[in-house]
Amino acid sequence: MKFRIYPAIDIMDGKVVRLYKGKKDEVKVYGDPLKFAEKFSEYVDKIHIVDLDGAFSGKPQNLDIVEKIIRDVGVRVQIGGGFRDYESIKKAYDIGVENVIIGTKALDISFLERITSEFEGITVSLDSKGGKIFTKGWIEEESLLVEDAYKMLRKFVNRFVYTVIDRDGTLLGIEKIKRFWGDEEFIYAGGVATPTDIIQLAEIGFSGVIIGKALYEGTISLEEALEVAKSVGKKNYSSS
């Protein structure tokens, strides 16, 4: 499987921002989502978008911007942030989103069954702090370990985003992770800052990585990340 790099565009109040560990009161603004989408599209054909307003409110707030990115830039999109009802998910797919990422509502099994039977590409976000799942904009702790959530949800989806909340937006690098998943597509997010981080994640068995703050702060360039991804992809760690 090809190891993929997903540049991240987190949107709040119509602008690209990065939060520190997901805290909305620790925010840095970077600018226009469309401009960053255009820049990233020169190197990749798919980007990762988070509707932060949606994550905190419980309903997507920036799908108009996402639609414009898809239409005007022509890049493929996976998006998360506030997708907790059928109508929001349907609207995202209607405007051309390729993968809708759900976190909070993934634990509602009847809901998950319904949407995975109707829509292709549903992705589950396993948002972790201290080994436990957090939901509703990473605010509420669930009495469920990440590994147990995965075992419960793998029956319905084969694509996951694994986010380490305490590393997100920190540039601190990755934490030690022991692979607990099978052959599903597993994408890492949280603290990636260097080529070494990417190599280590590939060695663990991740199939891709989401990079946000490191790109905006220049600790790694998208070109450099893609070169590393190309080299680790040839070694095919994920199938070992």
Curated annotation (Swiss-Prot):
Its main location: cytoplasm. GO terms for biological process: L-histidine biosynthetic process; L-tryptophan biosynthetic process. Its EC number is 5.3.1.16. It is an enzyme of class 5 (isomerase). Pathway: Amino-acid biosynthesis; L-histidine biosynthesis; L-histidine from 5-phospho-alpha-D-ribose 1-diphosphate: step 4/9. It catalyses: 1-(5-phospho-beta-D-ribosyl)-5-[(5-phospho-beta-D-ribosylamino)methylideneamino]imidazole-4-carboxamide = 5-[(5-phospho-1-deoxy-D-ribulos-1-ylimino)methylamino]-1-(5-phospho-beta-D-ribosyl)imidazole-4-carboxamide. Coiled coil: none annotated. The keyword Cytoplasm applies. Belongs to the HisA/HisF family. This is 1-(5-phosphoribosyl)-5-[(5-phosphoribosylamino)methylideneamino] imidazole-4-carboxamide isomerase. It comes from Pyrococcus furiosus (strain ATCC 43587 / DSM 3638 / JCM 8422 / Vc1). The lineage of its organism: Archaea, Methanobacteriati, Methanobacteriota, Thermococci, Thermococcales.
